[in-house]
């Protein structure tokens, strides 16, 4: 145990595999972001007390007493946080079973003071910008203090769709396991599996359902190709009164029933992600339930479309891999082609010579086909996966030189878009387009692609974090 434990988990963007990742037959391509959640765990003076603070929110302080039988008793009764309480309760239960009563009691002697903060990109910063009389630009966002106040409660804040709940849960679970000594290094493969299994269960329990799990998976492993675990593994323990031995046996890293698959993935050199927050949110569970209802009532129609969509998703992933291979085999040709194509529109790339240009254009074309199939699925299921307003914006983004692809992440809807670009200039030009766009209120996020998963950083590595250290 150390006096101060810091853990961090990234947000995510599901580039391909929206809806399909719900089933074990299909892969999804998830890119983790530079925007991250941080959990800071420190000792406090009150034995067996756990205080949790979310300083970016109003009414976001919770205090608990750990009883003699390691149950959590809330001291603050005016508000509750299902995610935090679920994480603390089950993680304590698990650690007592795994490490024994003595070890856990030893750590709790000094109590725990837990602070959880997320990078600004997880939440819409429009209210802060308006209060400062600033326009919604990347430059204005960069001028805000790190981890700035949202001036909202957890219930009223506008999220940007980067997977805040999964990143929060994963960083908190990792922090607890590290602080209590159940894992020693969060970046080791064994530790990642512990963190994943525990965080996956807690996230599902807090949400009241077993989801696809790609968001927790990317919070642990960073960017990767993901194939989900069999949801049946969690069914026996989705119970508040779950037996401790059953809980440990189910979540144990030696349990071979955990059959999730993680294949490392990176964007090719010179590629980056640009994200936008759109001021018209979609409720993801509603979109998903409507699509699944269509799939249930029209199984043949859905199966044909999902099979074709999966093939197109696989082709997109293959193009990415081919470009990485070419960057290693012919680095000079790769670099010069990327530079040339970065100043041209996608349909002009065919005039560039060599295999790199061929793969680049094929990547665009394959992803365009993915978008077309997602729109078709939206029409058949009567779900706005890529609404017409988004289509117009995405097509305009594709008219910016150096933009390889533009789409709606994950389940789609109205609240976000992403572009993958091959130059800083393309990034600036896309953001300029968003600023001038009149049909929707489009604001940039500062997040970039960052393939790192769970980490345990030093305070001085993260600007603005030191103010939360006691």
Task: Report the location of each language-model feature.
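FabD-like malonyl-/acyl-CoA
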Residues: 167, 416-418
């Amino acid at each position: 145990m150390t006096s101060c434990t810091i853990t961090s988990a990234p947000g995510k963007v599901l580039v391909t595999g929206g809806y399909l990742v719900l089933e074990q037959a299909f892969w999804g391509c998830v890119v983790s972001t530079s925007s991250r959640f941080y959990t800071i765990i420190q000792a406090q003076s009150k034995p067996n007390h756990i205080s949790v603070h979310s300083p970016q929110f109003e009414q976001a302080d919770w205090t608990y007493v750990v009883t003699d039988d390691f149950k959590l008793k809330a001291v603050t009764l005016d508000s509750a946080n299902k995610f935090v309480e679920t994480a603390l309760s089950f993680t304590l239960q698990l650690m007592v079973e795994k490490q024994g009563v003595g070890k856990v009691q030893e750590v709790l002697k000094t109590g725990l003071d837990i602070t959880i903060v997320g990078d600004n990109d997880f939440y819409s910063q429009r209210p802060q910008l308006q209060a400062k009389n600033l326009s919604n630009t990347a430059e204005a966002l960069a001028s805000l203090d790190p981890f700035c106040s949202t001036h909202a409660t957890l219930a009223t804040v506008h999220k940007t769709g980067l997977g805040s709940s999964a990143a929060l849960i994963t960083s908190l679970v990792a922090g607890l396991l590290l602080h209590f000594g159940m894992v020693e290094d969060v970046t080791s493969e064994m530790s990642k599996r512990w963190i994943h299994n525990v965080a996956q269960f807690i996230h599902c329990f807090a949400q009241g359902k077993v989801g696809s799990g790609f968001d927790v998976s990317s919070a642990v492993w960073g960017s990767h190709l993901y194939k989900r675990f069999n949801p049946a593994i969690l069914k026996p323990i989705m119970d508040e009164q779950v037996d401790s031995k059953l809980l440990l046996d189910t979540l144990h890293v030696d349990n071979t029933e955990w059959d999730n698959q993680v294949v490392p993935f990176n964007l090719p050199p010179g590629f980056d992600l640009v994200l936008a927050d759109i001021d018209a949110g979609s409720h993801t569970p509603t979109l998903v339930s409507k699509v699944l209802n269509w799939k249930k009532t029209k199984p043949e129609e859905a199966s044909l479309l999902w099979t074709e969509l999966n093939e197109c998703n696989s082709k997109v992933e293959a193009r990415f891999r081919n470009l990485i291979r070419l960057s290693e085999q012919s680095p000079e040709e790769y670099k010069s082609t990327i530079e040339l194509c970065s100043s041209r529109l996608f349909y002009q790339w065919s005039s560039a010579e060599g295999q790199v240009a061929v793969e680049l254009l094929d990547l665009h074309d394959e992803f365009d086909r993915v978008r077309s199939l997602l729109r078709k699925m939206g029409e058949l299921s009567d779900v706005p996966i890529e609404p017409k307003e988004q289509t117009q914006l995405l097509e305009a983004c594709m008219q910016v030189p150096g933009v390889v692809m533009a789409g709606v992440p994950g389940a789609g809807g109205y609240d976000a878009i992403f572009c993958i670009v091959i130059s800083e200039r393309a990034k600036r030009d896309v953001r300029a387009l968003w600023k001038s766009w009149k049909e929707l209120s489009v604001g940039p996020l500062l997040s970039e692609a960052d393939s790192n998963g769970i980490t345990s950083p030093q305070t001085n590595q993260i600007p603005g974090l030191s103010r939360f250290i006691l």
